């Protein structure tokens, strides 16, 4: 066959459907789970959809992506929301991002935050440090660092924050003392607004419905319950746990590289580097109570709470109740046992460790030369949202067809 696609999440489904739209049908998708959607799957819990992968929404910012996705699930089946997300920090509830909304805090806290921002390293000309924790202090000031960024990132990723690089944060604008002061005086937000400032969510379903429909559009081209165990680069062959072998001219892998128990034909140094790719696992847990808030989600940096974020389901999922939490797998021991619905996502977030860019550049370049292309959050080991992943998959199909190799 021309294309073997590993994984029926947003990346794999988009790539496959885009091929079909281009008139190419010589492909197959293999998926470990019994349903499509990857991290964006939904299940029914307490009478309404529960997104087992956590908070996944369709950002409005990519019209080309939305047009493509609406061809499977029309726009009239979606609600459009203005993002309402807050951070609970030191008894204050402030809008996200924190640096633009310090004006919402108690006056005494505003003063302390302003003082720390004024002497942040980036504002007084101190050289930029390399260590992650030092960089956070340098970029945001001690108050934002100690009250929010450091404890939150420890909860979301792990305690060893200095294993992370700073390359993924360097595009963040400096926190301007002048803008923050004006914000506090005028009582309104300044600065750049976060991603998902507006987003879509299905009216009648969970986010997973979109991917189910995309899978239905290529029915007969997906094999489920197929867990990949090995790959042979010499023959471009994939081996699954049941012993079946699949061979293709080009393999598109959207699954974690760590999932290959056996890798044949890859240089030892590249193969060895895969073990240095890190990730965090996240458990989602459902609670049936309605919260007295209009927010869509809430961030909790407090280290005494096990979870780092709450998704308030009844505020974005029509005719639902309750909320769910997101908790790093290393912290679930803090929770009291209960009978709530829970789901553990082994592969939730790729970690942006210091050496990751070097590892992935070499890995992806070499493997592409062998006809195996990494795509999406796990194929590229990048913390992409679903809309970005869809965009990348669409572009990859265009690139491969334009190259003339796959007419």
What spans do the regions from the language model cover?
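Short loop/edge segments at beta-strand edges and connector loops
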Residues: 80-82, 222-226, 376
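N-terminal Rossmann-like FAD-binding beta1-loop-alpha1 element of flavoenzymes
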Residues: 2-29
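Dinucleotide-binding Rossmann-like beta1-alpha1 core, especially the glycine-rich loop
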Residues: 46-124
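Active-site/ligand-binding neighborhood in enzyme catalytic cores
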Residues: 110-236, 254
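Mid-domain catalytic core of redox enzymes
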Residues: 22, 229-346, 362-366
């Amino acid at each position: 066959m021309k294309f073997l696609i590993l994984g029926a999440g947003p990346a794999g489904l988009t790539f496959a459907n885009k091929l079909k739209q281009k008139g190419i049908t010589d492909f197959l998708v293999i998926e470990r789970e019994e349903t499509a959607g990857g991290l964006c799957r939904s299940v029914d819990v307490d009478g309404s959809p529960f997104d087992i992968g956590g908070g996944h929404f369709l950002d409005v910012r990519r019209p080309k992506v939305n047009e493509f996705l609406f061809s499977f699930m029309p726009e009239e089946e979606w609600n459009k929301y203005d993002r309402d997300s807050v951070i609970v920090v030191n008894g204050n509830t402030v809008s996200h991002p924190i640096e633009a909304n310090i004006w919402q805090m108690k006056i005494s806290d505003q003063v302390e935050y302003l003082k720390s921002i004024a002497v942040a390293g980036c504002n007084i000309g101190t050289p930029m440090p390399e260590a992650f924790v030092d960089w956070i202090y340098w970029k945001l000031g001690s108050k934002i660092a100690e009250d929010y960024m450091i404890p939150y990132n420890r909860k979301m990723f792990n305690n060893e924050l200095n294993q992370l690089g700073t390359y993924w944060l360097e595009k963040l604008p400096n926190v301007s003392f002048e803008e923050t002061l004006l914000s506090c005086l005028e009582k309104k937000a300044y600065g750049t607004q976060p991603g998902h400032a507006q987003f879509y969510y299905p009216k009648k379903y969970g986010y997973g419905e979109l991917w189910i429909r995309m899978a239905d559009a290529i029915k007969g081209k997906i094999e489920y319950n197929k867990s990949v165990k090995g790959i042979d680069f010499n023959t471009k062959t994939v081996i699954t746990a049941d012993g079946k072998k699949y061979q293709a001219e080009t393999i598109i892998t959207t699954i974690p590289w760590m999932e290959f128990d056996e890798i044949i034909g890859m240089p030892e140094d590249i193969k060895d580097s895969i073990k240095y790719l890190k990730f965090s696992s996240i458990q989602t847990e459902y609670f049936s109570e309605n919260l007295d808030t209009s927010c869509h989600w809430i961030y909790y940096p407090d280290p005494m709470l096990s979870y780092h974020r709450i998704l308030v389901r009844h505020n974005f999922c029509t005719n639902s109740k309750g909320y769910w939490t997101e908790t790093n797998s290393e912290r679930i021991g803090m929770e009291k046992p209960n009978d709530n619905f829970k789901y553990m996502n082994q592969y939730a977030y790729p970690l942006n460790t210091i050496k990751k860019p070097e590892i992935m550049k070499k890995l992806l370049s070499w493997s592409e030369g062998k006809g195996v292309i990494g795509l999406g959050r796990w194929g590229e080991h990048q913390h992409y949202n679903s809309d970005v992943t869809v965009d990348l998959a669409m572009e990859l199909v265009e690139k491969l067809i334009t190259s003339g190799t796959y007419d």
